[in-house]
Amino acid sequence: MALKYPGGKEYRGNRLNAARQPMAADYANRGMTLEEDLNATNEYYRERGIAVVYKKPTPVQIVRVDYPKRSAAVIKEAYFRQASTTDYNGVYRGKYIDFEAKETKNKTAFPLKNFHAHQIRHMEQVMAHGGICFAILRFSVLNETYLLDAFHLIARWNEQEAGGRKSIPKREIEQYGHYIPLGYQPRIDYISVVEKVYFTV
């Protein structure tokens, strides 16, 4: 199926190939993508009344569908209706939370090309209205996941826009971000980090 942006440009997503090699570090979580881990984590939070967080659906306009059989419709062409914002949003302890989740195979830095200008602007707007906003970043080869406050991400994005570095060094993410250990249930307990960073005085 061909997905296209409103201007007609073809979408080539930055999702990892489904046939990728499994992660080597943790046998229980081997082969899971960041999105799958977060979806399972958010389901765990909802079932236990900890937080209500969902992945936002991407609005798509279906243009052409083939019907070889009535029960086997195949979408052949579709367009994104509008640029999406961030991946996840919800409520924790009465506060709105909004975040983007990205992963990279790079071991030493996180490429800023994984983000888009409209996502950064959205994060700025969420912060301006008092929401909690951050990015969950995974170094998939190292099987390490971090929570980085949107303030640091936006600062790096603005530096890049002014001609600066096009990635965030891993050592900087380790310094300003917060490591999220992988577990069984929940898989990525980012709410524990949110509690420490945004609610503990």
From Swiss-Prot:
Q: Which CDD domains match?
A: RecU-like
Location of the protein in the cell: Cytoplasm
Kindly state which keywords UniProt assigns to this record, in alphabetical order. Cytoplasm, DNA damage, DNA recombination, DNA repair, Endonuclease, Hydrolase, Magnesium, Metal-binding, Nuclease
The yes or no answer to whether the keyword Metal-binding is present is: yes
Query: Which co-factors does it depend on?
Result: Mg(2+)
Which top EC class applies here? Answer: hydrolase
Q: Molecular function (GO) terms listed?
A: endonuclease activity; magnesium ion binding; nucleic acid binding
Principal cellular location given in the protein's record: cytoplasm
Site described as Transition state stabilizer, located at: K102
How many cofactors are bound and how?
Binds 1 Mg(2+) ion per subunit.
Q: Could you name the domain of life of the organism this protein comes from?
A: Bacteria
Sorted alphabetically, the Gene Ontology BP terms of this entry are: chromosome segregation; DNA recombination; DNA repair
| Residues that coordinate or bind Mg(2+) | T85, D87, E100, Q119
InterPro entries xrefs: Resolv_RecU, Restrct_endonuc-II-like, tRNA_endonuc-like_dom_sf
Provide the Gene Ontology terms for cellular component.
Answer: cytoplasm
Q: What Enzyme Commission number(s) appear in the record?
A: 3.1.21.10
Q: Which reactions appear under catalytic activity for this entry?
A: Endonucleolytic cleavage at a junction such as a reciprocal single-stranded crossover between two homologous DNA duplexes (Holliday junction)
Keyword Flavoprotein tagged: no
NCBIfam families xref list: PRK02234.1-2, PRK02234.1-5, recU
- Role summary: Endonuclease that resolves Holliday junction intermediates in genetic recombination. Cleaves mobile four-strand junctions by introducing symmetrical nicks in paired strands. Promotes annealing of linear ssDNA with homologous dsDNA. Required for DNA repair, homologous recombination and chromosome segregation.
Name the family the entry cites.
Belongs to the RecU family.
**Name by which UniProt lists this protein:** Holliday junction resolvase RecU
Organism source for this protein?
A: Geobacillus thermodenitrificans (strain NG80-2)
